[in-house]
């Protein structure tokens, strides 16, 4: 019973505090930035030895450093939010074939999505010197920045699964309590 109650408490807390869970899945605001990463890599025709292309490593470094505990926690603090709830809103990925670093933010309002995106980009700019000195020389150019509103059936399904999970846990708790009560009655009858 204690484990089930613990799970119920966690599910209720998540439903209450999660920003992603409170977003209307039919009105998801998204802010996105696509950034182009260039390095000094050049193909040397006719040469057996080619200089290494660090683009993939640079993209991986940004992706890792923008989504690690320290980064997400610092951004979450700016918005008075717990790290685990901010982490649900922020997506960062790199594609070495296109040399793009993409940052995507989902939020309940356009203002929130844009503000969180600004914070992630500021964090990215603060990482430049570290990545430059440890991975390699590069430059970053903002190719596009967009804000949109969309429907997310995945989010709708996730929210429904969360509610269904809570209902299932509550039903399980009711069943356990009924079994406990029946056992108590049987013990009392046996004692008489």
Describe each PLM feature range:
Residues 1-20, 26-191:
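Soluble oligomerization/assembly scaffold segments of membrane-associated complexes
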